[in-house]
Amino acid sequence: MMLLQLSNVSVDTRLAPFSTQVAAGLQTHLIGPNGAGKSTLLASLAGLLPSGGDISLAGKALSLYSGPDLARLRAYLCQQQSALTMMPVFQYLSLYQPAGASLDAIATTIGYLCERLRLTDKLPRMLSQLSGGEWQRVRLAAVFLQVWPDINPDSKLLLLDEPYTGLDVAQKVALDSLLREFCSAGRSAIISAHDLNHTLQQADQVWLMSGGNVLAQGSTDKVMRANILSEVFEVDFQIHNFNRQNWIITKDF
């Protein structure tokens, strides 16, 4: 089932026309140098940035959804967002709870997400008192809450712009696990990323961008090749297999 379809999607001078489709249950990574257009593409897919061409989500044009209906289908984490000062974490999370879910189910899901992201003891804390990494995890918990399958059966898509920023190793592993759980429930996630080895291990498919163009797209093993990556990033890469797993390294490593 094709969950998301793009036909000649473009944004003025920032994003060249791009067409593709995304099946349910997949994790797609956007990679490319800074300024490649990854954030522009994600904001367009979220319906927050006007674009040319056509975007369809769950078989319906994105432009035809009302704000509340779109919020029920997809959640979007932007790259940067300032913390609201006079609000505790639990109140901030409540802003993202989907309509129609029971309070008990919402409380259970908040507890589950906060435990996984190690936020349980932060629930009463003011947002202004959080570190950068804590605030990032709160933002992640919020967008997961918005579309978590247990409390939002209509959810389809999670759009994350550099979600691993500010996370330590254990927190990155926790996020990986939540994303796999989300996608295994028939949803899809599209994520902008910078760690090429992480993309190599976690992504089902990859969109490789540079200068506002999607230069390569397809399965991870098709796109994550040394010659393709070297040309785009202007770094000499090679791929080595260690313990039956491929790793991307630079040639002068």
Curated annotation (Swiss-Prot):
Enzyme Commission numbers on file: 7.6.2.8
SUPFAM superfamilies (alphabetical): P-loop containing nucleoside triphosphate hydrolases
Top EC category: translocase
Signal peptide: none
Catalytic activity: an R-cob(III)alamin(out) + ATP + H2O = an R-cob(III)alamin(in) + ADP + phosphate + H(+)
Main location: membrane
GO cellular component entries: plasma membrane
Gene Ontology MF term list: ABC-type vitamin B12 transporter activity; ATP binding; ATP hydrolysis activity
UniProt: ATP binding residues: 32-39
Keyword Membrane included in the entry's annotation: yes
Classification via InterPro entries: AAA+_ATPase (IPR003593), ABC_transporter-like_ATP-bd (IPR003439), ABC_transporter-like_CS (IPR017871), ABC_transptr_BtuD (IPR023693), Metal_Ion_Import_ABC (IPR050153), P-loop_NTPase (IPR027417)
ABC transporter domain residues: 4-236
Pfam families per record: ABC_tran
CDD domains, per the entry: ABC_Iron-Siderophores_B12_Hemin
Keyword Nucleotide-binding: yes
Protein's cellular compartments: Cell inner membrane
Membrane topology note: Peripheral membrane protein
Function: Part of the ABC transporter complex BtuCDF involved in vitamin B12 import. Responsible for energy coupling to the transport system.
Oligomer status and interactors: The complex is composed of two ATP-binding proteins (BtuD), two transmembrane proteins (BtuC) and a solute-binding protein (BtuF).
Family label: Belongs to the ABC transporter superfamily. Vitamin B12 importer (TC 3.A.1.13.1) family.
UniProt-listed HAMAP family: BtuD
Protein name, per record: Vitamin B12 import ATP-binding protein BtuD
Organism of this sequence: Yersinia enterocolitica serotype O:8 / biotype 1B (strain NCTC 13174 / 8081)
